[in-house]
């Protein structure tokens, strides 16, 4: 019974880690600009940054993460079609960590980025009682990693679906406007032909008189 209660408590803590300490944000990074966000992380805590470019150009963005002193933890030019946007790290000191999404390399195209920045909650590392981690704790940690991956993939699919829907709606709108333009051109041409024929017959009638 104790093991069952321990497993329940661990699962609750894992759930809090997954859904209580992170929030998904979606933003548009305009051309020749960057957007930065801060997250206060305590020393020794593990943090996970998940990000994805869902619309714009080649689905590329420059990502840079810095510590409270401004030192670069990692920086890369991310292509969403070539790699997963995922970076985990352990905070070396307490303070405000900063992530920046830079689109300065693009002159005309804005990029739509969605990201989740999750930080480890108090107690997650202290789940196991005693000095050693039990097989049950190891299983729960494995489940935690799997759940994180599943949640990330679900969000990726959802945002990709939204991007495809936006593209489809935009295409449909262009088709509608193109059809309207064609109708207007046909009407103008028809009116012009009728006017020309009437004028031609009027000239013929005048010539006979």
Curated annotation (Swiss-Prot):
Extent of the signal sequence: 1-24
Q: Which residues lie on this side of the membrane: Lumenal?
A: 25-174
Indicate yes or no for the key word Metal-binding: no
InterPro entries from the entry? Emp24-like (IPR015720), GOLD_dom (IPR009038), GOLD_dom_sf (IPR036598)
Q: Which stretches are transmembrane?
A: 175-195
UniProt keyword terms in alphabetical order: Cytoplasmic vesicle, Membrane, Protein transport, Signal, Transmembrane, Transmembrane helix, Transport
Task: Give ranges for the Cytoplasmic compartment.
Answer: 196-209
The answer to whether the entry has keyword Signal is: yes
Its record classes its membrane topology as: Single-pass type I membrane protein
Residues annotated as domain GOLD: 34-119
Q: Name one GO biological process term.
A: endoplasmic reticulum to Golgi vesicle-mediated transport
Q: What role does it play?
A: Could have a role in the budding of coatomer-coated and other species of coated vesicles.
**Name this polypeptide is given:** Transmembrane emp24 domain-containing protein B
Name of encoding gene: empB
